[in-house]
Structures are given as C-alpha cells and as structure tokens.
Design a protein with these regions (language model features):
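Single-stranded nucleic acid-binding surfaces, predominantly the OB-fold ssDNA-binding core
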Residues: 1-102
C-alpha cells in the first residue's frame, strides 16, 4: 500500500515561509495544476526543512514538479463568536521538489 503523488504545475501564490515554535522550518505553497478544457486544480502543499528553505525562493508563475504524499488534518473553524465546526484539510506533504526550466 502506498500514498504517493506527483504534481507538475505552477506556483500561484507567494510561498509562506515560517518557523514552528520548536524551530522547524515550514513553507506553504499553492500549486496550480492544469487540466483539459482550460481548467486547473489548486493544490495546497507543505514543505519542511531544506525543502521549505528552497521553496521560499519560488516566485508566482514558476514551473515546478513535486513528489510527496497526501495527508489530512483536522482543525476547528470558528463560524461565529460562539459556534465552531470541526473540519478536515487535505494537503500534499512534499518530499522532493524541483524547478522545471522552460
């Protein structure tokens, strides 16, 4: 059984680089992957460590390829002052990424 994904797409939002309270480096990417008929999928990706440092230099429009796995996590969405809802987010945890020279 395996959970692996390969994506070939374009950075569509400036990467967000930060450090966790424990000092781990992390970068959030949003990748646009083109589909037939002029449609695109927008896939959130998360990078750690060296990959996060590398990804932090990406610019919008840059062509990249990503290898990773799909992961899910639960979070609490605040709907009103008193109301919350448990939700699930899915994202790609990146193990390898590279720029594609056009």
């Amino acid at each position: 059984k395996t959970n692996s994904i390969f994506l070939d797409g374009y950075i569509c939002k400036t990467p967000i680089y930060r450090k966790t309270p424990l000092g781990r480096e992390i970068a959030d990417l949003l990748l646009a992957v083109n589909r037939p008929y002029g449609k695109s999928d927008y896939i959130p990706c998360i990078c750690w460590g060296r990959n996060a440092r590398f990804a932090s230099g990406f610019e919008v429009g840059e062509h990249v390829q990503i290898l990773g796995r799909i992961q899910s996590r639960e979070y609490i969405k605040k709907l009103t002052e008193t109301e919350t809802q448990k939700r699930i987010a899915y994202e790609v945890s990146v193990s390898k990424l590279e720029c594609v020279e056009e």
